[in-house]
Swiss-Prot record:
GO terms for cellular component: cytoplasm. One of its GO terms (molecular function) is ATP binding. CDD domains: DEADc_DDX3_DDX4, SF2_C_DEAD. It catalyses: ATP + H2O = ADP + phosphate + H(+). This is ATP-dependent RNA helicase DED1. SMART domains: DEXDc, HELICc. It comes from Kluyveromyces lactis (strain ATCC 8585 / CBS 2359 / DSM 70799 / NBRC 1267 / NRRL Y-1140 / WM37) (Yeast). It comes from the Eukaryota. PANTHER family: ATP-DEPENDENT RNA HELICASE DBP3 (PTHR47958). Belongs to the DEAD box helicase family. DDX3/DED1 subfamily.
């Protein structure tokens, strides 16, 4: 990693004699879990191996341009069948669950299934398999991350995984996943949810937010058992499912990722997870529902569709989770979310727990989100700015016409790991992918215009190392956890600084280190001020050209920012009920601290939010490509 940063620090974007496009021989990155397997060709980027190059389109098959190297493989979606409560499942007399790897609920007790060595290997891998990334060399630094929690009677944080408050079976699964201790967001979210409180959690990317809601929800589910099906359920010719936990995510990829994590932590339990999203066969999803669903991961559009078809009832929902909640609301999913929360048979806000997680919560989004919460705790983990010091951020001044050549120089300096490149448009993603393939790189693309099958195959190829470069639009920017991404490149800098935060957070996750490189020119001056602030807060180098352009923009435009709705960056990780005040409330200098520190002497909450802000007038139109 240090080699990458060092090579980049010596990079001159004006130097066209770097040899980036020469026929150099470079070693192809092979993930640890596929090393030693038979490979065809030399594995040389420039050597046109594995059908990359030569006949550049030979590996596209019937896919459209931008397909790159995307053969199917491990990582394909399982719709809840097989060993996770599908066709092998059965309901025995007096019990709930069954099957080869499903536990049962019998006479008020949870009876876990027997261990399954093959399934454990598939779910959790082995300790040396870095494709199952858990924590890195800087994981212990999380103990020093500042934490602020505001609200009435905030519960004390935990310092380690133990029972109570966590269920013993869940602890076994956490150990199988090689999670040795909770991250700061998990230290606080577990007792907060266990206490029956609603939660709005803002934590930097790669900090364990998925475990932050899965652990407490599953722990309670394992202990309390399934809810009884309403008597009226048998009066319909359509067999409905009655999940007790619903997790909403903005994209298909994030929903699938959450589902994959849920499969790990529901191993041997009675809880049957399932995922539904648009772009895949709704008939197949309906068929899988016949085998039961207790924890449902869904995108808003597909869940709305299934509700209208009356295949799902939300009457038994105890937990509603909105992951990347700010993004869902900002993307225009508010009508679907309101239809799900307020227009269905879901219990009212007073009769369920609602949890919202994201890396950023601008105050305007907090106002809107408070409609769905009651007496909630606002949790802010990490410094305002929400980027990790595990990520080395590099800003290069690159004019648009120089971007391709500069990109080749960067890729030549990156000797190992996976590279994720972000562009702004779908057309740019396809064009850049084709360019990289022509240059001999193993690249593929993911964006909203590709079919779901193409997107899944592209992600599979990238995760397994068959494609070492993934070119993506914002569809992959939020929440995705792809192991071994060592370099993120913002080929196009987004207009919103929060999107920048989420993009670079695809590397440097769970205490691992990473590099994020951004191409900047005067066309991006509207975000210069906040970019300087972000770099300074994360102890990163601020190039002189960026400071100069920031001053130019401030003098000419009064320092106003572009992007969505003109949000104030300073409030994106602070409870809006506090009026943006930096003092007061509860705070901790680190996630492991058992006390709340001296937060200004306040012992109470910050008042009750009225929550009735109505519909957002500035939400963007919903794009069906997201759901």
């Amino acid at each position: 990693m240090s080699d990458i940063a060092e090579n980049m620090s010596n990079l001159s974007v004006q130097d066209n004699d770097s040899g980036a496009t020469s026929g150099d021989s470079r070693r192809s990155y092979v993930p640890p879990h596929v090393r030693g397997q038979q490979r065809s060709g030399s594995g040389n980027y420039r050597g046109r191996s594995d059908n990359f190059g030569g006949n550049e389109r030979s590996f596209f098959g019937n896919e459209r341009r931008g397909g790159g190297y995307s053969r199917g493989g491990r990582g394909s979606v399982n719709w809840g069948g097989s060993n996770w409560g599908g066709r092998n499942d059965s309901r025995g007399s007096g019990g709930y669950g069954g099957g080869n790897s499903s536990g049962r609920w019998i006479d008020g007790k949870h009876v876990p299934a027997a261990k399954n060595a093959n399934l454990e290997l598939e779910l959790f891998g082995v300790a040396e398999d870095k494709s199952f990334q858990s924590s890195g060399i800087n994981f212990d630094n999380y103990d020093d991350i500042p934490v602020e929690a505001s609200g009435n009677d905030v519960p004390e944080p935990i310092s380690e995984f133990h029972s109570p408050p966590l269920d013993p079976l869940l602890l076994d699964n956490i150990k199988l996943a090689r999670f040795t201790k909770p991250t700061p967001v998990q230290k606080y979210s577990v007792p907060i949810v266990a206490a029956g409180r609603d939660l709005m959690a803002c934590a930097q990317t790669g900090s364990g937010k998925t475990g932050g809601f899965l652990f407490p929800v599953l722990s309670e589910s394992f202990s309390s058992g399934p809810a009884s099906t309403p008597e009226a359920a048998g009066n319909s010719y359509i067999k409905k499912v009655y999940p007790t936990a619903v997790i909403l995510a903005p994209t298909r990829e994030l929903a699938t990722q959450i589902y994959d994590e849920a499969k790990k932590f529901t191993y041997r339990s009675w809880v049957k997870p399932m995922v539904v999203y648009g772009g895949a066969s709704i008939d197949n999803q309906i068929k899988q529902m016949r085998y039961g669903c207790n924890l449902l991961v869904a995108t808003p559009g597909r869940l709305t569709d299934l509700l209208e078809r009356r295949y799902i009832s939300l009457a038994n929902v105890k937990y509603l989770v909105l992951d990347e909640a700010d993004r869902m609301l900002d993307m225009g999913f508010e009508p679907q979310i309101r239809r799900i929360v307020e227009g269905s048979d879901m219990p009212s806000v007073d009769n369920r727990q609602t949890l919202m997680f994201s890396a950023t919560f601008p105050s305007e989004i907090q106002h809107l989100a408070s409609d769905f919460l009651k007496d909630y705790v606002f949790l802010s983990v990490g410094r305002v700015g929400s980027t990790s010091e595990n990520i080395t951020q590099k800003i290069l001044y690159v004019e648009d016409f120089d971007k391709n050549d500069t990109l080749l120089d960067l890729l030549a300096a990156s000797n190992e790991g996976l590279t994720l490149i972000f562009v702004e448009t779908k057309r740019a993603a396809d064009s850049l992918t084709d360019f990289l393939i022509m240059e001999g790189f193993k690249a593929t693309a993911i964006h909203g215009d590709r079919t779901q099958g193409e997107r899944e195959r592209a992600l599979s190829a990238f995760k397994t190392g068959r494609a070492t470069i993934l070119v993506a639009t914002a569809v992959a920017a939020r929440g995705l956890d792809i192991p071994n991404v060592t370099h993120v490149i913002n080929f196009d800098l987004p207009n919103d600084i929060d999107d920048y935060v989420h993009r670079i957070g695809r590397t440097g996750r769970a205490g691992n280190t990473g590099v994020a490189t951004t191409f900047f020119n005067r066309g991006n001056k509207n975000v210069a001020k906040e970019l300087v602030s972000l770099l300074s807060e994360a102890n990163q180098e601020v190039p002189s050209f960026l400071t100069t352009i920031m001053r130019e923009a401030s003098s000419g435009r009064g320092g106003a920012r572009g992007g969505r709705g003109g949000y104030n960056r300073g409030n994106s990780t602070r409870d809006f009920r506090r009026g943006g005040a930096p003092s007061g409330g509860f705070s901790s200098g680190g996630g492991s601290s058992g006390g709340w520190g001296n937060g200004g002497g306040s012992s109470g909450g910050w008042g009750n939010s009225s929550g009735n802000w109505g519909n957002s007038s500035n939400s963007s139109n919903s794009n069906s490509g997201w759901w």
